[in-house]
Swiss-Prot record:
<feature type="region of interest" description="Disordered">
    <location>
        <begin position="1"/>
        <end position="26"/>
    </location>
</feature>
<dbReference type="InterPro" id="IPR004389">
    <property type="entry name" value="Ribosomal_uL18_bac-type"/>
</dbReference>
<dbReference type="GO" id="GO:0006412">
    <property type="term" value="P:translation"/>
</dbReference>
<dbReference type="GO" id="GO:0008097">
    <property type="term" value="F:5S rRNA binding"/>
</dbReference>
<keyword id="KW-0699">rRNA-binding</keyword>
<dbReference type="GO" id="GO:0022625">
    <property type="term" value="C:cytosolic large ribosomal subunit"/>
</dbReference>
<comment type="subunit">
    <text>Part of the 50S ribosomal subunit; part of the 5S rRNA/L5/L18/L25 subcomplex. Contacts the 5S and 23S rRNAs.</text>
</comment>
<keyword id="KW-0689">Ribosomal protein</keyword>
<feature type="compositionally biased region" description="Basic residues">
    <location>
        <begin position="11"/>
        <end position="20"/>
    </location>
</feature>
<comment type="similarity">
    <text>Belongs to the universal ribosomal protein uL18 family.</text>
</comment>
<feature type="compositionally biased region" description="Basic and acidic residues">
    <location>
        <begin position="1"/>
        <end position="10"/>
    </location>
</feature>
<keyword id="KW-0687">Ribonucleoprotein</keyword>
<dbReference type="Pfam" id="PF00861">
    <property type="entry name" value="Ribosomal_L18p"/>
</dbReference>
<dbReference type="InterPro" id="IPR005484">
    <property type="entry name" value="Ribosomal_uL18_bac/euk"/>
</dbReference>
<comment type="function">
    <text>This is one of the proteins that bind and probably mediate the attachment of the 5S RNA into the large ribosomal subunit, where it forms part of the central protuberance.</text>
</comment>
<dbReference type="GO" id="GO:0003735">
    <property type="term" value="F:structural constituent of ribosome"/>
</dbReference>
<protein>
    <recommendedName>
        <fullName>Large ribosomal subunit protein uL18</fullName>
    </recommendedName>
</protein>
Length: 120
């Protein structure tokens, strides 16, 4: 039976979430990608608490970078989430791509976060 795109994404997401979990020492960097925007959260799964979040919908992000290239926006969100995480003392995370393929905007966010100082 062939799965459609949504079912394939859900299947990958369930498979990844079975293996990837965040702790207090090494929280999970979760990425959600919609058609126009990208969201990133650093989550402690044991406490069920979001420690840091950033998205392309934030007013300061929109005024600074405006509308346009979504891949460039992903790079900026990666840098922003890394800066906020490092400010809270979080250096090591576990990367959760949210069922999406590690390609394009998800990859751009991950590489920017690594360059900005996050380890995963």
């Amino acid at each position: 039976m062939k799965l459609n795109r949504v079912e394939s994404t859900r299947s990958r997401h369930r498979r990844v979430r079975r293996k990837v979990g965040g702790t207090g020492d090494r929280p999970r960097l979760a990425v959600f990608r919609s058609h126009q925007h990208i969201y990133a959260q650093v989550i402690d799964d044991q406490q069920q608490h979001t420690l840091v979040a950033a998205s392309s919908l934030e007013p300061e992000f929109k005024t600074q970078y405006g509308e346009g290239d979504t891949c460039a926006a992903s790079t900026q969100i990666g840098k922003l989430i890394a800066e906020r995480s490092l400010a809270k003392g979080i250096q090591k995370v576990v990367f959760d791509r949210g069922g999406k393929l590690y390609h394009g905007r998800v990859k751009a966010l991950a590489e920017a976060a690594r360059e900005a100082g996050l380890e995963f």
